[in-house]
Amino acid sequence: MKTAIFTVVLALAVFAVLSFGWEANEKALSEEFTELIHEKEAASETEARECRYFWGECHDHMPCCDWLVCRCKWPITYNICVWNRTFPEK
C-alpha cells in the first residue's frame, strides 16, 4: 500500500515537472512567434512607404509606384495614384 501511494505521488511529481517544462517551452515559442510577426510587419511597412499603390493618396513626398501616375480626379479634392496603362517589368 505504501509503495502504491509513493508511486502515485512520484508520478504526480514527474507530471508536474514535465508540464512546467512544456509550459516554459510553449511560452518561449510564443515569444519567438510574436517577434517574427513584428519583424514581418516592420518589413511590410517599409515596403509600403517606398511607393503608393493603386487608389492611394499621393503627393510630391509620397510618389506612386512605377506603373502608376498621380492624378487629380474630379470631384475628389486630392490626388490619387491611377494606372498609367503600362505594366511593371519583372
UniProtKB/Swiss-Prot annotation:
Cellular component per GO?
extracellular region
Q: Which GO terms describe its molecular function?
A: ion channel inhibitor activity; toxin activity
Q: Where is the signal peptide?
A: 1-19
Locations listed in the record: Secreted
Query: What are the residue ranges of the propeptide?
Result: 20-50
Primary subcellular site in the record, as a coarse category: secreted
Tell me the keywords, alphabetical order: Disulfide bond, Ion channel impairing toxin, Knottin, Secreted, Signal, Toxin
Q: Which cysteines are joined by disulfide bonds?
A: C51-C65, C58-C70, C64-C81
Check the record and name the InterPro entries matching this protein. Huwentoxin-1
Tissue spec: Expressed by the venom gland.
What superkingdom does the record give?
Eukaryota
Function (record text): Ion channel inhibitor.
Q: Which family is this protein grouped under?
A: Belongs to the neurotoxin 10 (Hwtx-1) family. 13 (Hntx-13) subfamily.
> Per the record, what about its domains?
The presence of a 'disulfide through disulfide knot' structurally defines this protein as a knottin.
| Name of the featured protein | U7-theraphotoxin-Hhn1d
